[in-house]
UniProtKB/Swiss-Prot annotation:
It comes from Nicotiana tabacum. The keyword ATP-binding applies. Responsible for microtubule translocation. May be important for the organization of phragmoplast-specific arrays of microtubules. Plays an essential role in stabilizing the mitotic spindle. Required during mitotic cytokinesis. GO terms for molecular function: ATP binding; microtubule binding; plus-end-directed microtubule motor activity. Residues 371-522 form a coiled coil. It comes from the Eukaryota. One of its GO terms (biological process) is microtubule-based movement. Pfam families: Kinesin. ATP binds at G95, Q96, T97, G98, T99, G100, K101, T102. This is Kinesin-like protein KIN-5C. It is found in: Cytoplasm; Cytoplasm, Cytoskeleton; Cytoplasm, Cytoskeleton, Spindle.
């Protein structure tokens, strides 16, 4: 589809005037911003408290600082040039009143003659500048031309001719301003009947007419503009230019420029229009609204365009959607009080951009045709003038006359078009005739050329025979050369093939070398990673083993100190216990010896009394009294000694109780210290705990053996002691003195022997334990490298040991309380014995008095009483001995309990060692898993990728093979070819005719 069928969009320009003096004084806000370079206009709005900018884009934008010359040079000059090319063009200004439409179109025309050389002032508008450009261009082209102008005004839907003579104007006013009618021209346009056309020859004449017509325009003062145009004006310039064709014919080119200054739309409330001015504003707005509806209909491509709703739209019909090029200049105000009209103007102008016109160049007319038409028009006008003057013409109704006139003009146009068509056909015939004549001339020329060519053909035949012989020789030579070339090509192909094979082998070798280098790089990287992994593992292992060694050394020292403390406590306890037993035995022996000596003294006194009873009765009574007193003193002394002994025993037990409490506190403190140190002990001690478990089992077995030996020894001691006590008790009746002495001696010897055995056993056990401790130290030294942390398990076991120590402490305190209660029981028993002895002494005194009184009569009875007293004393001694044995048994039981407590403690430590063994197993397993994961999973072995090339031997061609690929010398090849192909048998091949025409050699040579 051509541009003519598509159409051309209406060009829309936007011009924003600067602020007026009143607006500057009132500091009116600016709501319109122009961007000349991007051809955009931004309008600021506040809608519902929000600031919104609307942006419109036009073909060209001129801001407040733009001058009249800038607008004309950039936008109007091309349009005027198109008018001179034969187009019809329209320029009209559209916008609110007071925005500079008339200033843009007309400017200051009155000053146009004041400049030098007829130059226009800076304020000159589009119309004077267009007129000056038209005449300047025509004068520069030295063309023959004629220019006609018309100037009409549309006021309240009435058309007035602004160029009509003054007398005619008065006549029209006298006839109540008869308006000029609009008529259809039969070509889709309109014409104004009776409109005066002024022929002008210079720009100054047009300026004069323009000033005269502008002075007649209706203007009025409003609040928005002191000289507001109250009507629309249309200034038309019609140009006829004569052109000469190459054939010498003269044609007339016609162009028309319509310059429209529209009245401004206005808001009556802001413009202050009243009564007549309000009606004028209403008519103006009505015509502008119709123009807006026409624009909308054209943009939306509606079926009906309301051109006939207003005379303004009828006048602009060809400019909006017709065959005219149109330019719209939209003028706006930057002030905020004109925002509504500004937005309306911008909306209509933006929509008008989408209107498409289909401009056409006006058909050129022949000068003769134009003159003929003009003569006919003159004759018609003369006839009309004559008929009007003579009043003898035909009078018909006005409507019929207009209709016939329109039909006549339409027929005239058709006749004119047919004449033009006939002329075109005549031209085509003349062109065909000239072509025929030229073809005949060409035919005669070709005949002459044919004769000349025949002569040249004969000469060429002779030359051809000679040339064929030369050609035969040349072809034979070429055949030889072809044979040589083919042989060399074969050799070349063989060499090229061998080179390709060698190149393929070389590429394969390069690829294999690259694969080998990649493999070496992978192996190097893998070795580096494995070396780094092993170094890190070795450093971490050394760090953990160093920590294990230091922690193990500290723990071993603590355990050794703890065992030494326990051993020291046991030795101290045994020493103090041995001292207490020996002291108790010594005091009992001394008491028994003193008692026996006094008892023997009593026996001697009794015997003496029996011998001298008859002679010394009075002395017996005295001796009895003294005996009673001495016995009382003896018992008092013995009581004092017994009390001191029991006080000493009680103090000893108190000391033991304090030592046990101190031991418990020290043990608890050591367990706490052990807890703090055991939190840092590691668990990888499998071999150590295996050996330690064996040693513990041996130690436990030895302790069990020692315990059994001690138990058997104590049982044998008890059994021997009981047997000896029974035998001594039986013999005591016969001989009390010897019995008690032997009994105490044997008891001392037996106890001493047992104590010696116990000391030897303890010494042996100590030696055995020292040996095992040294063995354990050796084992510990070997296991120092394998410890790890087991914080949570050791902490739990430490708490259990602390609880166990607390329980043992409570147990020891209960035993000490039991010892204290036993001592108190012995004290009470001794006091009861002391009282019993006192009672017996008193009874003995009374008996002695009775014996003294009845000594002679009851001597035998005294002996009997003495025997009974002796038996009672023996029973008391026996009972006292049994109590002492029971006390010793109780003490032995407590010793066994203490030993069993020590064994329990040892067993608890053995259990702790078992737990440590289990933890060590777990930690050892963990380290083994870490090592396994490090050396089996993380430690990467090289895995073959399958891309490593297999060793292969290259196929290297031999030197003989390479030499065989050489081509034979040229002389040998020529000799071989000539033997197989003689020159006499060689036939010349038929030469194909060349498709490219060539000149004969003779012509080339000549």
């Amino acid at each position: 589809m051509s541009n003519k069928e598509k159409g051309v969009n209406v060009q829309v320009l936007l011009r924003c005037r600067p602020f007026s003096n009143d607006e500057l004084r009132n500091n009116a806000p600016q709501v319109v911003t122009c961007n000349d370079y991007q051809r955009e206009v931004a309008v600021s709005q506040n809608i519902a408290g929000k600031h919104i900018d609307r942006i419109f884009t036009f073909d060209k934008v001129f801001g407040p600082s733009a001058q009249q010359r800038d607008l004309y040079d950039q936008a109007i000059v091309p349009i005027v040039n198109e008018v001179l090319e034969g187009f019809n063009c329209t320029i009209f200004a559209y916008g609110q009143t007071g925005t500079g439409k008339t200033y843009t179109m007309e400017g200051e025309c009155k000053r146009s003659k004041s400049g030098p050389n007829g130059e226009l002032p800076q304020e000159a508008g589009v119309i004077p500048r267009a007129v000056k450009q038209v005449f300047d261009t025509l004068e520069s082209q030295n063309a023959e031309y004629s220019v006609k102008v018309t100037f009409l005004e549309l006021y309240n839907e009435e058309i007035t001719d602004l160029l009509a003579p003054e007398d005619l104007k008065v006549a029209l006013e006298d006839r109540q301003k008869k308006q000029l009618p609009l008529m259809e021209d039969g070509k889709g346009g309109v014409l104004v009947r009776g409109l005066e056309e002024e022929i002008v020859t210079s720009a100054n004449e047009i300026f004069t007419l323009l000033e005269r017509g502008s002075a007649k325009r209706r203007t009025a003062e409003t609040l928005l503009n002191k000289q507001s145009s109250r009507s629309h004006s249309l200034f038309s310039i019609t140009i006829h230019i004569k052109e000469a064709t190459p054939e010498g014919e003269e044609l007339i080119k016609c162009g028309k420029l319509n310059l429209v200054d529209l009245a401004g739309s206005e808001n009556i409330s802001r413009s202050g229009a009243r009564e007549g001015r309000a009606r004028e504003a209403g008519e103006i707005n009505k015509s502008l609204l119709t123009l807006g509806r026409v624009i909308n209909a054209l943009v939306e491509h509606l079926g009906h365009i309301p051109y006939r709703d207003s005379k303004l739209t009828r006048l602009l019909r060809d400019s909006l959607g017709g065959r005219t090029k149109t330019c719209i200049i939209a003028t706006v105000s930057p002030a905020v009080h004109c925002l509504e009209e500004t937005l309306s103007t911008l909306d209509y102008a933006h929509r008008a951009k989408n209107i498409k016109n289909k401009p056409e160049v006006n058909q050129k007319m022949m000068k003769s045709t134009l003159i003929k038409d003009l003569y006919g028009e003159i004759e018609r006008l003369k006839a009309e003038v004559y008929a009007a003057r003579e009043k003898n013409g035909v009078y018909i109704p006005k409507e019929r006359y207009y209709q016939e006139e329109n039909e006549r003009k339409a027929m005239a146009d058709q006749i004119e078009q047919m004449g033009v068509s006939i002329e075109n056909h005549q031209k085509q015939f003349e062109e065909l005739q000239s072509r025929h004549d030229s073809q005949v001339q060409q035919c005669s020329d070709l005949t002459c050329k044919l004769d000349v060519t025949q002569k040249q053909l004969n000469q060429t035949s002779k030359l051809l025979a000679y040339t064929e012989e030369q050609l035969r020789q040349s072809q034979y030579t070429l055949k030889e050369r072809d044979f040589i070339i083919s042989e060399q090509k074969k050799a070349e192909n063989a060499l090229a093939h061998q080179a390709c094979v060698l190149r393929a082998d070389l590429e394969k070798s390069i690829q294999e070398n690259a694969s080998l280098f990649q493999k070496i790089a992978r192996e190097d990287k893998l070795s580096t990673d494995n070396r780094s992994l092993v170094n890190n593992f070795q450093a971490e292992l050394a760090k953990q083993l160093g920590s294990l060694s230091s922690t193990l050394a500290t723990s071993v020292c603590r355990q050794t100190e703890h065992l030494q403390c326990v051993e020291k406590f046991c030795h101290n306890f045994l020493d103090s216990h041995d001292k207490a037993v020996l002291d108790l035995k010594r005091k009992i022996n001394s008491s028994m010896a003193l008692y026996i000596s006094h008892f023997e003294a009593m026996q001697n006194v009794v015997r003496l009394h029996k011998a001298t009873s008859n002679a010394t009765l009075e002395e017996v009574s005295t001796l009895a009294s003294s005996n009673s007193i001495s016995t009382k003193e003896f018992l008092d002394a013995e009581a004092v000694e017994a009390n001191s002994m029991f006080d000493e025993l009680q103090s000893t037990l108190s000391t033991h109780q304090g030592e046990m409490a101190h031991f418990a506190r020290e043990l608890r403190q050591r367990f706490n210290d052990s807890t703090e140190h055991l939190t840092n002990i590691s668990a990888i001690i499998q071999r150590f705990f295996d050996k330690l478990l064996d040693e513990s089992k041996r130690l436990e077995k030895h302790a069990t053996t020692v315990d059994e030996i001690q138990t058997n020894s104590i049982a044998e001691f008890e059994k021997a002691y009981e047997e000896q006590s029974k035998s001594d008790a039986e013999k005591l009746i016969a001989d009390v003195t010897s019995l008690v002495s032997n009994h105490m001696r044997r008891q001392k010897e037996l106890v001493g022997a047992r104590l010696v055995d116990l000391r030897e056993t303890v010494s042996g056990n100590r030696t055995f334990l020292d040996g095992h401790v040294s063995s354990m130290e050796g084992i510990t030294t070997d296991a120092k490298r394998k410890w790890q942390d087991f914080y949570m398990q050791a902490e739990g076991e430490t708490k259990e040991n602390a609880d166990f120590s607390a329980a043992k402490h409570c147990r020891m305190e209960s035993l000490m309380q039991k010892c204290v209660s036993t001592a108190e029981t012995a004290l009470k028993r001794w006091q009861s014995t002391h009282e019993l002895v006192n009672d017996m002494g008193n009874q003995h005194v009374l008996t002695m008095h009775s014996v003294v009184r009845n000594i002679c009569d009851n001597n035998e009875q005294h002996v009997t009483d003495f025997d009974s007293t002796r038996e009672s004393a023996e029973e008391d001694v026996k009972r006292n001995s049994e109590d002492i044995i029971k006390s010793i048994d109780s003490l032995s039981g407590e010793e066994r309990g203490s030993i069993s407590g020590v064994l329990d403690t040892t067993s608890a430590h053995s259990e702790t060692l078992d737990v440590l063994k289990k933890d060590h197993c777990m930690q050892s397993t963990s380290i083994e898993q870490i090592a396994l994961e490090t050396f089996q999973q993380k430690y990467m072995d090289y895995e073959p990728t399958g891309a490593t090339p297999i060793r292969s031997e290259p196929d290297v061609p031999s030197k003989v093979t390479i030499e065989s690929l050489r081509a034979m010398p040229m002389e040998v090849l020529l000799e071989e070819f000539r033997e197989n192909n003689s020159f006499e048998s060689f036939q010349v091949k038929e030469v194909k005719p060349s498709l490219i025409p060539r000149s004969p050699f003779s012509q080339i040579n000549n």
